[in-house]
Amino acid sequence: MPLRRHLLLFAFLLAAVPAWALETFGTSELTVQTASGPQKFSIELALTDAQMEQGLMFRRSMPASAGMLFDFKTPTSVTMWMKNTVIPLDMLFLDPQGQIIDVHERAVPFSTDIIASKLPARYVIELNGGTVARLGIKTGDQVTSPYFK
């Protein structure tokens, strides 16, 4: 096989690897109780180590009412980053009862800067960047979900 064909085949296989390696996620619904009323979201659940490592990496878009919930099982000092994440995100850090204890707005795509919770958190919810400001979500708001039961 000529060298050019080998290179094209290699490039194709290399491009396809992330698609093979991508995790699949379960889904649930959640509601954020804000001062202006309930805000509903359809979320994907990142529950395993592999799912949490992948998160929203490589996604080029996400519906406005969608997000991802990370469950760390017990309250811990949570650190996140945006490596290989194409879209800007808002992050909500929650305690075990679903109360928002910290918010990080508009995390920068592809950044490897560490985003840490100020307090130990059990859950992190990632939403499209700008959602927190648009809906008035803030520290102290309560999040409910069938997943929490």
Roles of regions detected by a PLM:
Residues M1-L8:
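Bacterial N-terminal signal peptides that target proteins for export
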Residues L8-P18:
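Bacterial N-terminal signal peptides
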Residues L22-K149:
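Compact, glycine-rich, soluble single-domain proteins
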